[in-house]
Amino acid sequence: MPNHIVLYQPEIPANTGNISRTCAGTDTYLHLIRPLGFSTDDKMLKRAGLDYWDNVKLSYYDSLDEFFEKNEGGEFYYITKFGRHVYSDIDYSDPNKDYFFVFGKETTGLPDALLQKNEENCLRIPMTDHIRSLNLSNTAAILAYEALRQQNFGALLQEPNYDRKIFQD
């Protein structure tokens, strides 16, 4: 049931760091397509990802073409405020499929040509017209958890597993 978050030319290190932490916590693959708007040594990137970077299944690509060549056979969904379909109306429940959620730059989104070519797989998250967009890391988390919800949360812990006990049995 591999789920994948794909960031096309991300610009803000804290967003990518937050997304990496979500990926580590959900066993979701993270794909970064260059150029990145920051160095992978950036303090903000590392701080947002905390000490979870070793648990992130991370791949880098030099272009969209390279990404698609190396990831054939999955279902690709392009997240854009222009999408004709709401993300929650799609079925992500098949455990034998790879689901790729592709996000664009924080400032400009995904290339128009890519969206036009894949119009039927363009998804949006409903929001008011009071803002231009939702935060990238929040949006990635929404998609990751919707896919996991439909997959009954896969191998994620169904019960709390903490050293500290708050509630009595």
UniProtKB/Swiss-Prot annotation:
One Pfam family named in its UniProt record: SpoU_methylase
GO BP of this protein: wobble position ribose methylation
EC category: transferase
UniProt EC number: 2.1.1.207
SUPFAM superfamilies, A to Z: alpha/beta knot
Catalytic activity: cytidine(34) in tRNA + S-adenosyl-L-methionine = 2'-O-methylcytidine(34) in tRNA + S-adenosyl-L-homocysteine + H(+); 5-carboxymethylaminomethyluridine(34) in tRNA(Leu) + S-adenosyl-L-methionine = 5-carboxymethylaminomethyl-2'-O-methyluridine(34) in tRNA(Leu) + S-adenosyl-L-homocysteine + H(+)
UniProt binding sites for S-adenosyl-L-methionine: 79, 104, 125, 133
Origin species: Listeria monocytogenes serotype 4b (strain F2365)
Protein name per UniProt: Putative tRNA (cytidine(34)-2'-O)-methyltransferase
Subcellular location: Cytoplasm
Family classification: Belongs to the class IV-like SAM-binding methyltransferase superfamily. RNA methyltransferase TrmH family. TrmL subfamily.
Keyword entries, A-Z: Cytoplasm, Methyltransferase, S-adenosyl-L-methionine, Transferase, tRNA processing
Single annotated GO MF: RNA binding
Superkingdom of the organism of origin: Bacteria
Keyword Methyltransferase in annotation: yes
Cellular component GO terms, alphabetical: cytoplasm
Known role: Could methylate the ribose at the nucleotide 34 wobble position in tRNA.
